[in-house]
Amino acid sequence: MDLMNTQLGKEYTVLQIDAEDPELETFLFSLGCYSGEPITVIARRKSSCTVAIKDGRYNIDSGLAGAIRVEDR
């Protein structure tokens, strides 16, 4: 499933990033968002969501959130 279809406040594990743009993958990697890392959706809006990755919180748009594939921890 992708981040836009997760439960709020529940921790998931990143499976893969399905971004067509390698720069997006590099950007997410710089935030600590890569395969095997825990991620939690804190808040969701129509066009974006706020996620907790490691010690940071980030607001990402729905397109990017849809490219992040996760599984239950």
Locate each region found by the language model.
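Short alpha-helix capping/helix-loop boundary micro-motifs
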Residues: 23-27
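Short beta-strand-centered segments at strand-helix junctions
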Residues: 28-32, 61
